[in-house]
Regions:
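Short, surface-exposed loop/turn motifs at beta-strand boundaries within globular domains
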Residues: 34-36, 46-48, 65, 141, ...
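Short acidic-glycine motifs
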Residues: 60, 107, 126, 159, ...
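Outer-membrane beta-barrel domain signature, strongest for Gram-negative TonB-dependent receptors
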Residues: 177, 183-362, 368-370, 404, ...
Length: 426
């Protein structure tokens, strides 16, 4: 929190520090699971696209257009919420800093900051500090994590770490596209440490990661009374009448009948329950995040003062596709795709005195240059709106609902096989 080694009890601010061993003991893989060991902070992963953090009554919301009150970091690099919420591995510790943060943390954040520190290569030690860790659980969940140090010389060491995680989530089935829920995360990290003297330490880290999730949106309910087919039949007859009178384009009734009449013959007579985990839409909601992080850290002990320099460059490409037609009322669905490309470059310099126990001070400079480009594609394709815009809303107003959280909660009951892990160290 203060950018130097101190006892948490000696720091004049609210700090929760979670060690890597605690993360391993509780099998904590991402921020949404940190609530097991940290109080006063709420982590919520709404879906693969959105995640929020609430700290001291203020919320970090990636969809918000304003400056965020909570900033997340990995190895002192400020990142977007999607990157911070990615799965943690080979982690040294996590610090939760509550309250306004400024000079010492880089980006000004009014509610707090979250610092994730990964393990660095150890110089001057012959130990590999390596391990291979595997885990299996319900719903086709598997994880393989490995890391090890490679000692190149007495002053130069390299650490390599990687993770692969796959899961079928809550096993939601899309009976229209026959594509079921799946989540995949792959990441690799290289850490290079050079320590030519006791006074100078140089560390460089590169991380590449990709998250890919297909998450059908389950629905619950029935065809309603009247059924959707009866409603569409009525619209077809009405459009045919308008067409015969010249008030609608030729072929409108046929287009409506073809494009907007799913049979729903594959739905049980009693409808769908939340616990069924069934989706009906014709597109496959998908979230894909790919990120690269370059980070250079230089620390120099000048005797009475300590100099710290930080350079970072991070790139993120996020693609989100959703189908707004959850109930499958349109043959081609109602897809909406949003792609966001973000590049962030930062430079930070800090000079701290270390020659006085009575007066401590830090002089810092922080610069951030970020660019974000967002493109959105909203495609109704061949929909009813082309022939009868006024009928769009009532056409999907039957009794199917989209209690996504309720459906997922109903499917997320404790499984018969809890997570089983194996660890091999060297």
């Amino acid at each position: 929190a203060t950018k130097k080694e101190e006892n948490v009890q000696d720091i004049a601010q609210t700090v929760n520090a979670v060690s890597g061993s605690t993360l391993d003991d509780y099998q904590i893989r991402d921020l949404s699971e940190l609530a097991q060991v940290v109080s006063g902070v709420e982590f919520t992963k709404i879906d693969p696209r959105r995640a929020t953090i609430i700290m001291r009554g203020q919320k970090l919301d990636p969809d918000g257009g304003n400056d965020q009150p909570i900033q997340g970091y990995i190895d002192e690099v400020p990142l977007r919420a999607q990157d911070v919420f990615s799965q943690m591995y080979d982690t040294e510790r996590v610090e939760i800093l509550k309250g306004s943060q400024g000079t010492l943390q880089g980006v000004v954040s009014t509610a707090g900051a979250i610092q994730i520190y990964t393990r660095s290569a150890q110089v001057g030690s012959g130990e590999k500090n390596g391990y291979v860790k595997t885990m299996w659980a319900d719903n086709m969940t598997s994880m393989v994590e490995a890391a090890s140090d490679l000692h190149l010389s007495d002053t130069l060491s390299l650490r390599v770490a990687g993770l692969r995680n796959t899961s079928d989530g809550n096993e939601i089935r899309n009976i229209r596209t026959h594509v079921n829920e799946s989540h995949n995360f792959d990441s690799g990290r290289i850490s290079l440490s050079w320590q030519p003297s006791d006074e100078l330490s140089v560390r460089f880290k590169y991380q590449n990661s990709e998250t890919d999730s297909i998450y059908p949106q389950p629905v619950a309910g029935s065809n309603g009374t009247p059924s959707y087919e009866q409603v569409v039949n009525g619209y077809v007859a009405e459009i045919a009448l308008y067409e015969s009178l010249g008030f609608a384009p030729a072929g409108s009734a046929a287009q409506l009948a073809y494009l907007n009449r799913p049979t729903y013959g594959d739905i049980p007579a009693g409808g769908l329950k939340a616990s069924d985990g069934v989706a009906l839409h014709f597109q496959n909601p998908r979230q894909n995040n790919s990120a690269e992080i370059h980070n250079l850290m230089i620390d120099y002990d000048m005797g009475s003062h300590a100099l710290a320099l930080r350079f970072s460059d991070s790139q993120n490409d996020a693609m989100g596709l959703i189908d707004r037609d959850y109930a499958g009322a349109y043959v081609y669905g109602y897809p909406q795709e949003v792609r966001t490309n973000t590049g962030i470059e930062t430079f930070e310099m800090r000079i701290s005195n270390q020659d006085s126990d009575k007066l401590e001070y830090t002089i810092g400079f922080f610069s951030r240059n970020s660019q974000t480009f967002t493109t959105a594609d909203l495609d109704r394709s061949f929909s009813i709106t082309e022939v009868a815009p006024q009928l769009y809303k009532p056409a999907v107003g039957f009794d199917y609902k989209t209690p996504n959280q309720a459906c997922n909660a109903a499917r997320a009951a404790p499984g018969s096989m809890a997570a089983k892990s194996w660890v091999l160290t060297c």
